[in-house]
Amino acid sequence: MFLTNLYNITKKEADAIVIELSDKNHPVFQAHFPNKPILPGFIHLDIIEELFDLDISIIKKAKFTTFVVPRERLKYTINDKKNIILCTRDEQEIARFQIS
């Protein structure tokens, strides 16, 4: 429900997927926050589950280093051996998740 039309996949590899977020008119951005829209942190996890066909049951660690705004391109990279997923923008880490 939250993810409908939120992003488009622009590149897909075995361990990495690049997406482009929708504009500020998407309901996710309208709710968080109307005058300064940012992507809610929990939505990253929903995107990761959908992109990599995962069922995340435990979040061991989550680190966010900056905000994500509409229209940005994000790259999610998964390291299956360590259960770590990185989210980067222009090669700069913006979020890191350790899951199981």
Report the location of each language-model feature.
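Hydrophobic residues in beta-strands and at strand termini
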Residues: L21-S22, F64, I99
